[in-house]
């Protein structure tokens, strides 16, 4: 047995030999290789997933170092998906890594998503892209889990999975929900579930203030500004990583459950 094979013995002993085969055969797409997506990709690789497709077009920036796995002083200005792919191959040389150096949009949505994925993990922060992907996957019965905003939070114990229609105190998920209802025909009944899982947090957000302090209230100066890396929510790796790990845990459980169900039906 090679060192690479030995590296995943623990995963097989956790899920069982038969279920682990399903994980090794799985093809999972990660959209957005950033504060959450890098941890998603890492967890998938260390779980022995057989094929991973990474979709992103960003380069590593110094402002990413606080929360992104690929962000090091030595990797600044390098292409994120390439840095992540090199890391995955060093973890699991047998993993097939596909790179799509693009941002998901109207012109490439079909090309990016119509690839026989077992699961799509939406870790991007574009509302437009998230809405398109959720709608596309739902109507084609492609399993997808979307991830809400991980900024402005300090308590990883508050991270959980709920139906996208039922998130609280998550501006990103709320905006996504609004777009899905207004542009994609999702139910406007506030009690109706979307049947799309969302990783989110119940923690009240910490907003940066112009004087350098932090408050639970959004200041007038912050309210009209774009919440980007330089002036938006602060973030820490132990929260963004938790979002990613919880998403991967659910995805692997779903893949294993589907495999077991199909085996029982034989």
Task: Label each residue range with its predicted role.
Residues 1-29:
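N-terminal charged helix/coil linker that caps or initiates catalytic domains
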Residues 2, 115-119, 124, 129, ...:
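Glycine-rich phosphate/adenylate-binding loop
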Residues 30-32, 55:
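Conserved N-terminal Rossmann-fold NAD(P)-binding element of oxidoreductases
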Residues 36:
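Hydrophobic/small residue at the entry helix of a nucleotide-binding pocket
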Residues 49-92:
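Glycine-rich phosphate-binding loop and adjoining beta1-alpha1-beta2 segment
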Residues 63-70, 153-163:
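Acidic/polar active-site rim loop that often engages polyanionic ligands
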Residues 100-109:
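Conserved SAM/SAH-binding loop
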């Amino acid at each position: 047995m090679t060192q690479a094979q030995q590296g995943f013995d623990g995963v097989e002993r956790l899920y069982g030999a038969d279920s682990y085969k399903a994980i090794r055969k799985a093809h999972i797409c990660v959209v957005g290789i950033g504060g959450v997506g890098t941890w998603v990709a890492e967890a998938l690789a260390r779980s022995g997933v057989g094929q991973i497709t990474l979709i992103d077009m960003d380069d590593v920036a110094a402002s990413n170092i606080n929360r992104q796995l690929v962000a090091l002083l030595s990797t600044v200005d390098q292409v994120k998906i390439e840095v992540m792919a090199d890391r995955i191959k060093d973890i699991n040389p047998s993993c097939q890594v596909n790179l799509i150096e693009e941002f998901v949009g109207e012109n490439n949505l079909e090309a990016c998503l119509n690839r026989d994925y077992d699961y799509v993990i939406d870790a991007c922060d574009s509302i437009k892209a998230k809405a398109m992907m959720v709608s596309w996957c739902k109507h084609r019965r492609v399993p997808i889990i979307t991830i809400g905003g991980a900024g402005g939070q300090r308590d990883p114990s508050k991270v959980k999975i709920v139906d996208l229609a039922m998130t609280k105190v998550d501006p990103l998920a709320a905006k996504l929900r609004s777009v899905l209802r207004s542009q994609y025909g999702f139910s406007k009944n506030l009690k109706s579930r979307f049947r799309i899982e969302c990783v989110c947090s119940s923690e009240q957000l910490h907003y940066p203030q112009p004087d350098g302090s932090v408050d639970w209230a959004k200041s007038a100066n912050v309210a009209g500004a774009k919440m980007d890396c330089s002036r938006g929510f602060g973030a820490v790796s132990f929260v963004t990583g938790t979002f990613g790990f919880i998403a991967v845990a659910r995805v692997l459980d779903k893949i294993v459950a589907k495999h077991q169900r199909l085996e029982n039906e034989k």
